[in-house]
């Protein structure tokens, strides 16, 4: 038996659809691949029987409803498209909202990707020590500082009391930044790093634990030796 790639795909779809019918007959709710395969197979069979495209577009939304599928499947399948062979040629059948509401209330079904958050506001780093200080960019180029950069080790042209910033980063949402234009003075809010307190990299001033007094003294000495303003 010689089969074209399209015919092989049709057999694969039929196999998936038969599995869907078997599971549906057991009372199981269908997942996304099962629901898609079943609807597509019914449409292709309708085309083989000689039904029109317009008829199959309407028929495609009557095969399954939300009672037949797992929660969220209907939201994942807003449109179903399948190419079928009709008596007058190959045509694309597009069914919008192929899975219509069933008898069960939709309110009990969660939306895919929905965030179920507790009541109240979210407080960033609410349980960590903070500090507020003023910093000025004494350089001739802009300085941009990311949310989790060790503020003690930022650009040496930024002038502020660096000792107060040891072990701290900007108290802003992760992934955001604060930009200092040349000569700009800004007040910033800092918050202490969490976790174990080990700080490595950045400008190479710390490379130790922020809770270690000896590490802090050594970092200050390196900052002064390398002419970091405010150290």
Curated annotation (Swiss-Prot):
Please name the top-level EC class of this enzyme.
hydrolase
Whether Hydrolase counts among this entry's keywords is yes
Q: Name one GO cellular component term.
A: urease complex
Question: Which GO MF terms are attached to this record?
Answer: nickel cation binding; urease activity
Answer yes or no on keyword Isomerase: no
The pathway entry for this protein reads as: Nitrogen metabolism; urea degradation; CO(2) and NH(3) from urea (urease route): step 1/1
- Name the Enzyme Commission number(s) assigned to this protein: 3.5.1.5
What is the catalytic activity of this protein?
A: urea + 2 H2O + H(+) = hydrogencarbonate + 2 NH4(+)
Q: Name one GO biological process term.
A: urea catabolic process
Provide this UniProt record's keywords sorted from A to Z: Cytoplasm, Hydrolase
The annotated region (Urease beta) lies at 102-231
Instruction: Please give the family membership noted in the entry.
Output: In the N-terminal section; belongs to the urease gamma subunit family. In the C-terminal section; belongs to the urease beta subunit family.
Among PANTHER family, the record links this protein to: UREASE
Q: Give the quaternary structure.
A: Heterohexamer of 3 UreC (alpha) and 3 UreAB (gamma/beta) subunits.
Q: What is this protein called?
A: Urease subunit gamma/beta
Q: Which organism is it from?
A: Pseudomonas syringae pv. syringae (strain B728a)
